[in-house]
UniProtKB/Swiss-Prot annotation:
Lineage: Bacteria, Pseudomonadati, Pseudomonadota, Gammaproteobacteria, Enterobacterales
Pfam hit, one: Multi_Drug_Res
Record field: transmembrane: 6-26, 36-56, 64-84, 88-108
PANTHER family registered for this protein in UniProt: SMR FAMILY PROTON-DEPENDENT DRUG EFFLUX TRANSPORTER SUGE, SPERMIDINE EXPORT PROTEIN MDTI
InterPro entries, A to Z: Small_drug/metabolite_transptr, Small_multidrug_res, Spermidine_export_MdtI
Top-level taxon in the UniProt lineage: Bacteria
Role summary: Catalyzes the excretion of spermidine.
Membership in a protein family: Belongs to the drug/metabolite transporter (DMT) superfamily. Small multidrug resistance (SMR) (TC 2.A.7.1) family. MdtI subfamily.
Gene assigned in the entry: mdtI
The protein's name: Spermidine export protein MdtI
C-alpha cells in the first residue's frame, strides 16, 4: 500500500469536486447543444482525472476510485436536487443507501 499523506486526500477531494462540476456543466450543455458548457464539462473531466492520478500516488487505486465514484454520485445527486429539482424514487434511494454502505465498507477494509 502506498504511503498515505493528507495531500493525497486533498487531491481525491479535488477530483470529486471536479467530477461534480463536470456533471453539472454537462447538464447545462443540453446534450452539447450549448458548446461552451460542453467544453467546460470536458475540461473539468480532464482535470478530475488529473487530480485522481495524483491521489492514487498515496491511496490504493481501488479505494480512491470507489470513493471518487461513490462520493461523486452522491454529490451529483444532491446537485441535481438543488439545481434542477430532480428527485429519486424509492428504488433510487435504496441504491444510494447501498452505495454509501459499500463506501463505508471499503474504507473500513
Amino acid at each position: 500500500m502506498p504511503q498515505f499523506e493528507w495531500v493525497h486526500a486533498a487531491w481525491l477531494a479535488m477530483a470529486i469536486v471536479l467530477e461534480i462540476v463536470a456533471n453539472v456543466f454537462l447538464k447545462f450543455s443540453d446534450g452539447f447543444r450549448r458548446k461552451f458548457y460542453g467544453i467546460l464539462s470536458l475540461a473539468a473531466v480532464l482535470a478530475a482525472f488529473s487530480a485522481l492520478s495524483q491521489a492514487v500516488k498515496g491511496i490504493d487505486l481501488s479505494v480512491a476510485y470507489a470513493l471518487w465514484g461513490g462520493f461523486g454520485i452522491a454529490a451529483t445527486l444532491a446537485a441535481g436536487w438543488v439545481l434542477f429539482g430532480q428527485r429519486l424514487n424509492n428504488k433510487g434511494w435504496v441504491g444510494v443507501v447501498l452505495l454509501l454502505i459499500g463506501m463505508i465498507m471499503i474504507k473500513l477494509a
